[in-house]
Each structure stands twice: as structure tokens, then as C-alpha cells.
From Swiss-Prot:
Protein name per UniProt: Ribosomal RNA large subunit methyltransferase E
Originating organism: Janthinobacterium sp. (strain Marseille) (Minibacterium massiliensis)
Keywords, sorted A to Z: Cytoplasm, Methyltransferase, rRNA processing, S-adenosyl-L-methionine, Transferase
Compartment annotation: Cytoplasm
S-S pairs: none
Reaction equations catalysed: uridine(2552) in 23S rRNA + S-adenosyl-L-methionine = 2'-O-methyluridine(2552) in 23S rRNA + S-adenosyl-L-homocysteine + H(+)
Amino acid sequence: MAKNKLNKNWLHDHINDPYVKLAQKEGYRARAVYKLKEIDETEKLIKPGQIIVDLGATPGSWSQYVRNKLSGSVGGGINGTIIGLDMLPMEPIADVHFIQGDFREQEVLEQLEQVLQGRKVDLVISDMAPNLSGIAVADAARMIDLIDLAIDFTQHHMKPSGSLLVKCFNGSGYSYIVEKFRDEFKTVVQKKPKASRDKSSEIFLLGKTLKNPL
């Protein structure tokens, strides 16, 4: 009974969420787009001509936003390159190169290199999150693993002057993640966008300029 009530409350909040309504109106696949939008508007992350990788891209709202920011002249197309990576499938988005699979696997990396053609990435964005169990220690370990994967990806594929934006949770293990970012990046910024739900502990970390690029 309690679970049904919880589900009904979530559904009510979701339906009446202004960001859900705005996403539907503006044609975005998820309300999460407004978290990236706010961070981008304050930090000026996305610029014409950039190569941008979206880790954990599905369902695609972040890639949609990046695509809109990089859209070119009236003739169509974009001024830049967008690559979405996810283990789950994603409906196609115009001008977005989507690769389904685990980016630790050689086959996926080969597909990535076919798109990059030796070029380095300007910006890596990640809305990846683990499946939460409710056990703080286990959930923190899963979150740290994802952050480590994102950092390792930037070390191998991003320009030294590039930036990494990741989602994490302000709880067990968060201080470790912040210190990890400070070890890896010259500038670290913590962001809590207005679109993050009040009850959510999610917070975004932005690292700018690698300290020790490979």
C-alpha cells in the first residue's frame, strides 16, 4: 500500500513538474536537459566548432541540446561534432553520431576513433548514474566507478584544455569524488541546477583543464 502511494505521489509530481511540461513543449526527450542548459549558460561550455562527447546519452535530451547549440546556418547541419555513447539504444538525433555499447570495449573504441579521426575532444558531458540499491556504501562505490570511467575517458580522448561535466550524488563518497576531480583538473566547480528536484541529492561537478594529460 505504501509503495503504491509513493508511486502515485511520484507520478503526480512528475506530471505537474514545470520542467517536464517545458521539455514536452520544446521537444526535448527529458527534463534533464534544463540541468545542462543552466550549467552551460553560466559556464559557457558549448561553443561552435567543438567536438563533444555525451556519455550515457540515452534518451538523448543532452545531445539534443548540444545539437541545437551547434546548429549552423539556414542550410542546416551543425558547426561541430557530437558523439553519444550508451549501453542502451537511443532513437536517432540528426547530426549526432550514436554508438551503442560499453566504451571500455575495443569494438566501441574503434567506432569512436572512426568518428574522431585522430582529433581530441573539447568537452565530455556525463549524466550517467548507477542503479541505486539504497545501501549507501554500495551506491557510493558504484558512483565512484562511473566517475573514474569518465575521468579515464577524458585522459585518453580529451584535449588538455578541455572540460568534463559529470553527475554525482552529495552523500557517501562525494568528498572522495571532489578530491579526485581536484587531483585531475586545474579548476573544479560544483553546480546544483534549479532543474534538480528539491528532494534529490544529485550535484554536478565540472572539471576544467587537465593537470596531467597523457
